[in-house]
Amino acid sequence: MTLNNGGKANERGSNENPLQALSKNEAFLVPEFLDTAQSKEKAIASKVSNTLHMSTEESEFPQQVSSTPMFSENTVHPRHEVSPKPSSKNTQLKQENISKSSGYSKQTNYSNTPKSLAKTTHPKQGSTLKPATNSTHYREDDIPKSSEDIIQPKKGDRPKSSEDIIQSKKEDRPKSSEDIIQSKKEDRPKSSEDIIQSKKEDRPKSSEDIIQSKKEDRPKSSEDIIQPKKEDRPKSSEDSVPSKKGDRPKSSEDSVQPKKEDRPKSSEDSVQSKEGEVHKPLKDSIQSKETKVPKSPQDSIQSKEDKTHRPLKDSVQSKESEEPKSSHESIQSKEDKIHKPLKDSIPSKEGDIPKSPEDTIQSQEEITASEEDTIQSQEGNTIKSSEEDVQLSESKLLGLGAEIETLEEGLVRVIKDKEEFEEVLKDAGEKLVAVDFSAAWCGPCRMMKPLFHSLSLKHEDVIFLEVDTEDCEQLVQDCEIFHLPTFQFYKNEEKVGEFSGALVGKLERSISELK
């Protein structure tokens, strides 16, 4: 370890002379183990925080913990354009830095590769060429920082640099991690959602603007940051290395503050340039997203809402206007067709839509009223017709009954006593008198009675008499009636024929023969 540090101190002897004197005088093995152990813990914690933080955001937009929000936001899109530059720089810097930090590659692997691994492993999902660019620039940026700023104070001020860097790591990683994580928390909804939306929608703008901003800002960020790192690293190495001797909180503050200042200048300038450029591409792309994305999601949603609301409002209003016009017009035309035969016209369609159900209800009431009237008229007509028919039939029946009664009264004479019977026989003279002895309770008598009346109509020269056996008991005894019905025939007051029973043919033959 000491040979490599001595070799590296000899390699870097032109720029960083205070570190060589410090590297020869002071032992640094204990702060190495302190740095490696604490950098392992913090690298593991940074890995845990990065993996926990990046696990939720690996699918959307992976960003690095400490300083990769600069490059992750800036180097989102130019994967294919910037990757040949850091690939050559990767190999050269890896060869130079492996040759330089071969002894400290373990420490830089323990100290910086958790940064680079935590910073380079996660962006491989989202931007594998980006961490190549970012890790190479970050290796250009941080391995000279880590190799020169951290390794050389391991030569000179490992007690101070380890404590100060540990303190600066204790002080600055919550600042850098919390602030950058908060900036990630604050910027990733902006960067991840907006850049993802800018990836989805404004990759020509965001990629061209960010590629141009990367082409403009990589001379600014890479050259300006690398040059102030090259300029500030002699400053930060000369300033921070003596300040690492005395003022490593200055170097940690100055180096961390240039990390805070440069990274806020790089991160803020690059992040602000990212916020400015990401916000410019994000604001431009977000504004273009707000112009495009809100035009596409919001304006497209609003335009969709406008288009949907305009086609929906216009189409819905047109549908409301057309559906009230089409449906209401068709309904109203149906209602007009229904109401025009019912109520002849409905004037305003929109005003009369409440009128149309009322009118339809009223028309239905009128229809029901007309139906009731027709039903009542039908009932009245049917009742009237049925009553009239019944009355006509009853009148006809009554007329027939009256005729029958008149026939009965006129043609068949009912005998009530014996004196009347003898008087009729005297008045008849030589005419044939047919007498029917019957009773109301006798069934064959009721059956023969209509036939007897019909024969009285047929034979006008024959006198037909009817005797109720219950009313004229004395006459029944005198005439010796033993069966019902019994028919007797008289001529010149003398009995000429007689038979008993409901014999229709014999009755007709007897009347025709004895007449």
Swiss-Prot record:
Keyword Disulfide bond: yes
Gene3D superfamilies: Glutaredoxin (3.40.30.10)
InterPro entries listed in its UniProt record: Thioredoxin-like_sf (IPR036249), Thioredoxin_domain (IPR013766), Thioredoxin_H-type-like (IPR050620)
Residue stretches making up the Thioredoxin domain: 398-515
Region (21 X 15 AA approximate tandem repeat of Q-P-K-X-G-D-I-P-K-S-[PS]-E-[KE]-X-I), start-end ranges: 92-405
Keywords, ordered alphabetically: Cytoplasm, Developmental protein, Differentiation, Disulfide bond, Phosphoprotein, Redox-active center, Repeat, Spermatogenesis
One GO CC annotation: sperm flagellum
Listed Polar residues bias regions: 61-75, 85-136, 375-384
GO biological process terms held by the UniProt record: cell differentiation; cellular response to reactive oxygen species; flagellated sperm motility; spermatogenesis
Name of the molecule in the record: Thioredoxin domain-containing protein 2
GN (gene name): Txndc2
